[in-house]
Regions:
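C-terminal motif of bacterial Sec signal peptides marking the signal peptidase cleavage site
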Residues: 17-18
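Catalytic cores and adjacent binding grooves of peptidoglycan-active enzymes
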Residues: 135-138, 143-214
Length: 214
């Protein structure tokens, strides 16, 4: 019996150890967070984006349709499109990368073809755009060399000596406290100036706060 005790003790020890829970020292994989859903505001082809314009081919050949992403007024990332001059493509992309990083809210970015090339309707919708073939004698928009951002929040306001003219868009009021509006030292304004754009706030006859041009 005494000879069996060590054997029984060994078997008992093995049984006890086998019942102990095993510890897995391997790190459990961390589930990757799902990317934020992007809301698509428009998805035109180039042909669709210039459909119905009165611009001659010599002008439309200078244009390019690009995608941009931005936070809209709902706090979500949206994707829109800008029809602009090829000379501005790199700068517009850089500006919108900055706008996205700053989380500066942009209502929507849709080519004006959606509004049948009616600039007033586009502005009433607070729509951001570049090319619109109008006022060809002086408007940089006629060649896609300008961009208007949140025009309803940043309306064109005539200076006192020209107050007999109507501000645009109609019924819009400038309030710099509202998100999406510009002021002289606003980071987005400074970024556009850094990129070589002229800001409409400094025009001789009016304060065209939504307008940046080259």
């Amino acid at each position: 019996m005494n000879k069996l005790k060590p054997v029984l003790y060994l078997l008992f020890s093995i049984l006890i150890l086998s019942c102990q829970p095993t510890v897995d020292n391997k790190k459990q994989p961390v589930a990757a967070s799902a990317p934020e859903e992007i809301i698509v505001d428009c998805n035109y082809t180039f042909a669709e984006a210039i459909e119905g314009t009165k611009a001659p081919r010599s002008v439309t050949e200078q244009l390019e349709l690009i995608d941009v992403e931005y936070y809209s007024m709902d706090g979500k990332i949206h994707r829109g499109q800008i029809l602009t001059n090829k000379k501005l493509v790199a700068d517009i992309k850089t500006a919108f990368e900055f706008i996205l990083k700053e989380k500066f809210p942009v209502e929507q970015v849709i080519p004006v073809v959606k509004y049948n090339w009616n600039d007033e309707l586009s502005m009433q919708a607070n729509n951001t755009y570049s090319f619109c073939y109008r006022n060809v004698s002086y408007s940089r928009h006629a060649y896609g060399m300008a961009i208007d951002i949140n025009p309803f929040l940043n309306p064109l306001r005539w200076k006192k000596e020209y107050s007999y003219r109507k501000d645009q868009p109609a019924n819009a009021t400038y309030n710099p406290e509202i998100p999406g509006t510009f002021s002289p030292n606003h980071p987005v304004v400074l970024k556009f100036k850094e990129l070589g754009f002229r800001w409409g706030r400094n025009f001789k006859r009016n304060h065209d706060d939504h307008h940046f041009e080259k």
